[in-house]
């Protein structure tokens, strides 16, 4: 049997003197621990000096800083060619001429972009908005630079650090230490001569992985400005410091069928050949539409692109990535490739190309690991692919970007819409249109992107920045915010007509051809709808009309949707006329909205807001299809002039006060003749609703000079005329009182339409919906409780800038004085006197119910919904304007007190007792 033998060479005895010398060298070689300690000691010293420079930078103003940057950039510019040659000599990569261009770019374009930028002290003042912005340096910066663009990156980072007064400590790539140090030294020396601190720019003298790691993790370093490959970026982000890191690029370039093919070919070759492809934004694959594919290849060859054959392609792949197409091996770029000439790469791969070849090009079938050349190469080697259509091309580009997420994507086309589609779809932070991607990506030469040699990849590439890194990234912006009073408003219908028989305006109103009259059955029975029809028939033009007469006392979502559907599908009116009490007017507003904007869901408009101008859902302007005319027949709601509409959702049992100025009617007609038929009970309820409107508007946190006069005068008119309008014998006195009440209700509506209301209405909406009590009557029972509640100094007042101190007690004192009620010696006395006067007016002058129990609400039912009362009242849109934040339990106490006709304090005791009993009963059941 044959045997395999291992043949070993004869052992050669080592010279004793050589062996001894080796031992001495090994003995003097530092251990890993010693290397780490030395690196940390060097970094400690550098950072300590940098922190000293940071303090010294504080003494410089903007003018001095700008002079330093200018002098430093000029000094570097003066040596741009020397530095370029040093970089090529040391690294063996790139072209001297192109590196010189990049150095000029760093000195010239970057400095020009920085000129005029404020980075010291107050950098922006906005007297209108009350914001001052103050810039301060982020602190000591750790600068990490690559071997691919060593001198230009060192210059760039030094200049933006100087501009922001940030001392920078560099950890240069060991393969480019000498040229990088020289670049930094030139900038530093010029900066110091111009007045910068001595240690404004420093670097690690003995570069190593340990030293760079120690620098990035040093507690004295504020942020890391990293440029390099994925490993360096990951290390920067893993340091525990804020990092401005970028990563790998794998830019696709799509060449569309509608393109200037000569320009595209020129740009593609120029870009790929520039500095032998070492800018990370350079195209790594050309994906051309089939209609121009052959022509593009022809134009590329005209520009001396060398297209490899199948054998050469395999050799190229093996040399560059250690595998060939279809081998199933994951490609790994040979570190000797980046920045080498096409001739060098071809020869190293095992074939020859012409001496004047500009780039190497290889036709590939797909974008994947099975086509290694579709990966990032940082060399003058280009993959070229054919796409049958736009969609296939886009898919190829997307696959390219998965190998270099977030960096850059290029497109060559004359179709702007296609560019936008491409930009939306590609996960790249720079979309370069009809430009060389390398020079387009760094900005300012071919486009208006900020000039930079550190290009962010956004979240796609695991970066904290998506733009081109600039000086703005090295400053902390502090904002000095002045207290501002929010801009307020006074909005009412464009036209408001009043006086007896004002409905005659309908005869002359412009543009009525097709009208819908929104009302309830009572309006028809009383003949009021006929009066409206008579006015329409008296017009010079013929008006067709429809009547919606099914509005309930508490209009529902279903009702308004039904009415809007009729308007949309059957009639398409140009005018909506709402006549009646608050219910028809409120219903008509939402019908108007859904008629003009059927796409809007009721669930969107009902959401609560704190500032109507900033609400999450904004109702679009109304009036394009129809005008809304509101004609009140009761003297209470004020809906004819407000942006409010109260709608009940029977599915949830909620009564929603919808509010948006788009709902403000186009025209209000306040005709007191129509209110003369109000039943006594309705007149009392409506009158107290209006009184509550005026008082809540006056104490609201949104109250202002424009609404105060309306609110106070409306309250006075109501106080003086409500009883007579309800109880008076038929005659002139009662008629005058009814007219005053009708006007007062509208004035109160104007006041609360801009000042809003408060917790009394928030609770009234809730209790009215749950307990089925008339809205005005609910307000009349709650109002004295709310006056007393708001009349105390609260635990938590409502926050509103203009409301700079709690003045509700003084405001109630104003109301009492205005109504002729004894104000006492203090606001507290005035509050109590006002509350008692309101109770007396309600009980004795109008004979209204004193409590919810008196209204016939079942006791057990009331207690069963008490929690809902508290929660829903807090959620109500009226509640946020209350001067005191109404706590849920406080509102429950008020509700209990109002149910039994006792004080809030007594209501609290009853609630606690009841809840205690319920808890005991629940425990015993368990």
Go through each PLM region and give its residues.
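N-terminal Rossmann-like NAD(P)+-binding subdomain of aldehyde/semialdehyde dehydrogenases
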Residues: 3-132, 160, 302
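ALDH superfamily catalytic-core signature
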Residues: 29-30, 37, 155, 233-368, ...
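Conserved C-terminal structural/oligomerization subdomain of aldehyde/semialdehyde dehydrogenase
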Residues: 31, 58, 351-486
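Glycine/threonine-rich beta-strand-loop-alpha-helix active-site module
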Residues: 112-114, 183, 558-673
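Rossmann-like NAD(P) dinucleotide-binding subdomain of oxidoreductase/dehydrogenase enzymes
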Residues: 122-263
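Carboxylate- and glycine-rich phosphate/diphosphate-binding segment that chelates Mg2+/Mn2+
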Residues: 641-755
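Gly/Pro-rich interdomain helix-loop hinge
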Residues: 770-864, 880, 904, 910-913
